[in-house]
Amino acid sequence: METTKNRRVRFTGGLHEPAQDSTMCGNAELQSRERTKTRQRVYNESKRDLVDLLRVYTCLNSVRMFTFVNFGRRIPLAWPEGYQLVINNCRDENEYADEKLDELAGLVCCPERLVVLGYVKKRGGIGSEPCYWFSKGDIVVLLGGAGRVYAHTWLLPQQLCRVGDTIDDFLRKGLKRFYYAHQLVSSLQFVVEDPEVDGVRSCRDVLCFRDRHIGRSFALRWPKNETLLFHRRRDSFAFVMCDEARRRLAEMCFFGSFGYKYFGDEGRISLYVADDGQIFGFNDNDEDGRPRFVAEDFQQFRRIGVTQYYKSYVFRREQPEWALLPTCHLSRMFYQKTWRQADADVLFLIARNDERNKFPDAGTRSAVHDVVR
């Protein structure tokens, strides 16, 4: 093994990669600490500005009064950086009248009441007041029962994203769960130096892109320590019990894989592109033996990566084939996930008890199920 003053090569399980020097590691650690401090500062500011809302958020009529009294107030978001939530009930906008809110609530798998909290705008400079006026393409933040937070835009009218399981969750994460927010700020899950990457959409485009970058590996922003590799491979489909799934997989085209950066080829999740450009993930070692929906097209894949292979927060009027469904807010899994909020929030505990009185099976339902129309 060769070593030099500033660079050494480390071998692990037959794979080798450059080891980062101490300077690079130190800079990355410093930047990570700064980002953590910034997120904590924004979280503290947001909680301070929304203290009145946190006293009444379990009563949606009181929330409407809060938006009326605090009309135009701006609350910083943890993500995207530099964006704010403008408090506004949007009562003057026909798109968010009560009947429209009922239609949006109908996208959720179980009963949910929604009220508009405000819309999202980029922070402007002095004298830029008009930039805070509402426009139809803005992201609108809605509040549901027990502080569940949703995001919607009329550019994607048939989709509703749960961006926060609780208000505290929303204040810490911002709009990270919402695909359109990643598109809005051009946030990418992996970076490829290719002048033609913005035009990659069809199945043929993806395969040409793969051939240009075959054998190259790119770090994913999430999950941490996972990489995306463009290459060729043929899966066995040995565990695919569904004839339809096996047939569809055979019709798709393999273009790469993702997984933990030290894993060999056999331990990675395969990526397939369909004729219409949709992207699916497939684990050849999975006993379930079914593909999972990952992205509508390659451009969406660049922005949200493989998130939808692992979990989903988006309720759609028509779910893509083999897409994961969001966790039901009345399920046992969701109740267990959010229960720690009750330790610090008596209002949340009261709202959860009221919800159980209204829906006796709340907290016992299955994690995912289809929308009951």
From Swiss-Prot:
One Pfam match: US22
InterPro entries the record matches: US22-like
Superkingdom assignment: Viruses
Entry's family note: Belongs to the herpesviridae US22 family.
Name of the featured protein: Protein U3
Native source organism of the sequence: Human herpesvirus 6A (strain Uganda-1102)
